[in-house]
C-alpha cells in the first residue's frame, strides 16, 4: 500500500491505567492530591527562595529553577490524566499529543542539564571555596540556566519534528496514560529510523554527558571531603550535597528504567511512567525542604512574617 493511499490518524486513544470506574475514581482522587501537593511544594519553594534574602546564593537560584521546572513538568502530564479519569474520555488530538511529547522531552532534557549545573556549582563551592564567588557569579548563573533551557528546548523541538515527519495510518491506541515518545513511535507506518537515531543520540550525548559531569563533580567533592581532617567539616560537606545527590539518583534511576525498557504497555512500564512523571516532581521539594536547614528556617521566617500582617 502506498503512503499516499493511507488514512491519516487525527486522534490517538490513551488506554490509561484502568477501565474499572471505581478504580478510575480512586485514581482521580489520588492523582489530584499528588498534583496539588506537587504544585504546593514546588511553588512554595520558589516563593521562599525568591523572598528570603538569606537564600540569595547560586545554589538556591538553581534550586528555584528546578522547582519551577518540576511544577511545569507535572502540569504537562497530570491535568490531561485527571481529565481522562473524570470524563471517561480517552482520546487526545494529534496536535495535543505532539505538544505533550515536545514539552515532556524539553522538561526532561532541561532538568538533566540543571542537575549537572547544580553539581558543578557544589563542586566549585567545595573544591574552590576562595574563588567560588568569582567563578559562579550572577552572570555565569544566568548563562548556565539559559543554556540549560535552550538545550532542553532544542532537544524537544528536534525530536518532535522528526516524529512529526512519520506517517500514522493504522493503529492509534497508545498503551500509556500520556503521550510519550516510545509508545507513540510504535504506531508509525513509515520508517522510524531518523527518530530512533535522534533518541539514541539524545540519550548518549545529553544523558551520558550530563551523567559524566555529575559523577566527575561528585568524585572531586568526595575526594576533597576525605582530605579534610575535621569530622565536622566532612559532615557539613556531605550534608550539603546529600539532598542534591538523592534527587539526582531518583531522576536518573527512574528515567533510565523508564526509557531503556522497550515500549510494550506492560504493567511495569506503567508503574515506571507514573513514578517518573507524577511521583518524582513531588519528591524533589520534599527532599530539599526536609534535609536543608536553611530552607526550614527561611520557611519559618516567611510564616512568621505572614502571621504578623494585620488582618
Curated annotation (Swiss-Prot):
Residues assigned to the Cytoplasmic compartment are 50-65, 119-140, 217-236, 291-311
Keywords, sorted A to Z: Cell membrane, Disulfide bond, G-protein coupled receptor, Membrane, Olfaction, Receptor, Sensory transduction, Transducer, Transmembrane, Transmembrane helix
List where in the cell it is found.
Cell membrane
State the membrane topology.
Multi-pass membrane protein
TM regions (residue ranges): 29-49, 66-86, 98-118, 141-163, 196-216, 237-257, 270-290
Please give the chief subcellular localization of this protein. Answer: membrane
The record, for Gene3D superfamilies, names: Rhodopsin 7-helix transmembrane proteins (1.20.1070.10)
Keyword Transmembrane helix found: yes
Q: Extracellular compartment: which residues? A: 1-28, 87-97, 164-195, 258-269
Disulfide bridge partners, by residue number: 97-179
Q: Name one GO cellular component term.
A: plasma membrane
MF terms from GO for this chain are: G protein-coupled receptor activity; odorant binding; olfactory receptor activity
Taxonomically, which superkingdom? Eukaryota
Described function: Odorant receptor.
The similarity annotation says:
Belongs to the G-protein coupled receptor 1 family.
- Protein name as annotated: Olfactory receptor 5BS1
Annotated organism of origin: Homo sapiens
User: Lineage in the entry?
Assistant: Eukaryota, Metazoa, Chordata, Craniata, Vertebrata
Amino acid at each position: 500500500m502506498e503512503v499516499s493511499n493511507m488514512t491519516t490518524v487525527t486522534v490517538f486513544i490513551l488506554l490509561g491505567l484502568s477501565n474499572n470506574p471505581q478504580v478510575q475514581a480512586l485514581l482521580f482522587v489520588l492523582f489530584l492530591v499528588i498534583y496539588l501537593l506537587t504544585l504546593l511544594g514546588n511553588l512554595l519553594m520558589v516563593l521562599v527562595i525568591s523572598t528570603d534574602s538569606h537564600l540569595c546564593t547560586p545554589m538556591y537560584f538553581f534550586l528555584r529553577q528546578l522547582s519551577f521546572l518540576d511544577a511545569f513538568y507535572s502540569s504537562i502530564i497530570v491535568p490531561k490524566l485527571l481529565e481522562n479519569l473524570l470524563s471517561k474520555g480517552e482520546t487526545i488530538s494529534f496536535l495535543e499529543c505532539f505538544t505533550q511529547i515536545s514539552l515532556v522531552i524539553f522538561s526532561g532534557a532541561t532538568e538533566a542539564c540543571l542537575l549537572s549545573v547544580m553539581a558543578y556549582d557544589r563542586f566549585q563551592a567545595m573544591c574552590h571555596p576562595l574563588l567560588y564567588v568569582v567563578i559562579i557569579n550572577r552572570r555565569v548563573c544566568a548563562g548556565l540556566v539559559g543554556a540549560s533551557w535552550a538545550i532542553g528546548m532544542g532537544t524537544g523541538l528536534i525530536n518532535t519534528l522528526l516524529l512529526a515527519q512519520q506517517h500514522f495510518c493504522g493503529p492509534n491506541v497508545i498503551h500509556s496514560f500520556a503521550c510519550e515518545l516510545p509508545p507513540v513511535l510504535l504506531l508509525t507506518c513509515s520508517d522510524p529510523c531518523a527518530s530512533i537515531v535522534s533518541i539514541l543520540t539524545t540519550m548518549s550525548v545529553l544523558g551520558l554527558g550530563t551523567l559524566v559531569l555529575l559523577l566527575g563533580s561528585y568524585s572531586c567533592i568526595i575526594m576533597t571531603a576525605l582530605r579534610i581532617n575535621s569530622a565536622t567539616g566532612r559532615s557539613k560537606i556531605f550534608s550539603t550535597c546529600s539532598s542534591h545527590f538523592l534527587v539526582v539518583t531518583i531522576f536518573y534511576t527512574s528515567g533510565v528504567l523508564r526509557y531503556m525498557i522497550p515500549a510494550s504497555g506492560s504493567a511495569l512500564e506503567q508503574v515506571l511512567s507514573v513514578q517518573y512523571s507524577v511521583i518524582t516532581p513531588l519528591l524533589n521539594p520534599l527532599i530539599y525542604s526536609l534535609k536543608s536547614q536553611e530552607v526550614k528556617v527561611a520557611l519559618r521566617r516567611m510564616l512568621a512574617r505572614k502571621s504578623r500582617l494585620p488582618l
